[in-house]
């Protein structure tokens, strides 16, 4: 699955990943490859990139949205910093 994390100022991350864990309004959820299309609001919290089944990267995000379509997840956030 391809993942992009974008802020209004710049691209934070772009690359192929196993999946991503996101802080949704209703709770934490995970998106893996070939996920059904979805658009969801995100609240401030931790975003975890699952690079493979063992390696992860963690980011603190401010609110935003995620769109998943055609095996690509695009995360649009107000602000982000690597944890």
What spans do the regions from the language model cover?
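Compact, glycine-rich, soluble single-domain proteins
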Residues: 2-83
